[in-house]
Amino acid sequence: MQVDLLSSAQSAHALHLFHQHSPLVHCMTNDVVQTFTANTLLALGASPAMVIETEEASQFAAIASALLINVGTLTQPRAQAMSAAVEQAQTPWTLDPVAVGALDYRRRFCVELLSHKPTAIRGNASEIMALAGVANGGRGVDTTDAAANAIPAAQTLARETGAIVVVTGEVDYVTDGHRIVGIHGGDPLMTKVVGTGCALSAVVAACCALPGDTLENVASACHWMKQAGERAVARSEGPGSFVPHFLDALWQLAQEVQA
């Protein structure tokens, strides 16, 4: 199994495209991470919108550059709104199947959504393996599997759905079912702040709206988040000071490619 690495030039090119196109991302995400997700997108140069009412969601999904479906705080009314948005979306959409391996209702819902052909799927190893039908597991939103162990499941899921599948962990793996790109970096402190994975899913959604190689663009999203995490940790004393430094680091990365 060959795992390629993303070059700095590829990442910088994707970030230049990101700034140039400034995607409008319709984030149907969970209640815990909305502010952090919106600020992450803004720091990189995208425009977030959090529209959740069923009638409005289906209307707005057709306007946005990209759509994110994150099932972290799923309810039946929210599931109806998400389904309506996916059905009306004429743009790329990304699925974040939070805790899909641990809870039956959201697993059934996410499997139903797969028939609408997501452009990308982003999850930890346990979530991707569960969604692929390989195993059930995970401790709530936390993974109990190493990212590398989920590569075969990610490849299968990508081939079956046509999506770019992202498995996040100490090393992130991005695959279209054939090619695999590995992204190293980041820091364990990133796992001590709620929402870094969910925010990444929003950035992945935005990258799916960019022109060019979608796999490379999505892999670049992982690279930016890991880079920003490393920079933020170097300036932080713990999780509380990490968040503002992380947002600053994303902003600085975006400014650097414009210089």
Swiss-Prot record:
CDD domains hit by this protein: THZ_kinase
Keyword terms: ATP-binding, Kinase, Magnesium, Metal-binding, Nucleotide-binding, Thiamine biosynthesis, Transferase
Cofactor(s) the protein needs: Mg(2+)
Positions bound to ATP: R122, T168
Enzyme Commission (EC) number: 2.7.1.50
Role this protein plays: Catalyzes the phosphorylation of the hydroxyl group of 4-methyl-5-beta-hydroxyethylthiazole (THZ).
Protein name: Hydroxyethylthiazole kinase
Native organism: Escherichia coli O127:H6 (strain E2348/69 / EPEC)
Lineage: Bacteria, Pseudomonadati, Pseudomonadota, Gammaproteobacteria, Enterobacterales
